[in-house]
Curated annotation (Swiss-Prot):
Pfam families reported for this sequence: Globin
Annotated family: Belongs to the globin family.
Domain Globin: 2-143
Residues that bind O2: H60
Name of this protein: Hemoglobin subunit alpha
Binding site for heme b: H89
Gene Ontology terms: cellular component: blood microparticle; haptoglobin-hemoglobin complex; hemoglobin complex
Length: 143
């Protein structure tokens, strides 16, 4: 699924509105994923506390949203721009790439909760397409 120029514009504009709360969104989305999809906890078994709002969940949620923020600036070459993270997740962390879709869903839910007025159908579609493209880029090294 390719991103149109309009999709990219919508994602950029929406990211401008949310970037100040990106850490909060990331922490909540990650906590939501770990609760709703407990099988994803296996990748974080080295954390002492996996509960929503815990320090490790908050920290990693911020890391995730920071990477997504970087990806917003790389929309014209997500595969190349996210190559390092793809390597990390495929070869070192060995994350099942299906989990990228699960996290993307939880990010969308969290964005809709935190930004109800801004999360219009057009924004929803564009951000969903962007996260799907990002997930595909992160899964690129799995092939």
């Amino acid at each position: 699924m390719s991103l149109t120029a309009r999709d990219k514009s919508v994602v950029n504009a929406f990211w401008g509105k949310i970037k100040g709360k990106a850490d909060v969104v990331g922490a909540e989305a990650l906590g939501r994923m770990l609760t709703a999809y407990p099988q994803t906890k296996t990748y974080f078994s080295h954390w002492a506390d996996l509960s929503p709002g815990s320090a490790p969940v908050k920290k990693h949620g911020g890391v995730i949203m920071g990477a997504i923020g970087n990806a917003v600036g790389l929309m014209d070459d997500l595969v190349g721009g996210m190559s390092g993270l793809s390597d990390l997740h495929a070869f070192k962390l060995r994350v099942d790439p299906g989990n990228f879709k699960i996290l993307s869903h939880n990010i969308l839910v969290t964005l809709a909760i935190h930004f109800p007025a801004d999360f219009t159908p057009e924004v929803h579609i564009a951000v969903d397409k962007f996260l799907a493209a990002l997930s595909a880029a992160l899964a690129d090294k799995y092939r």
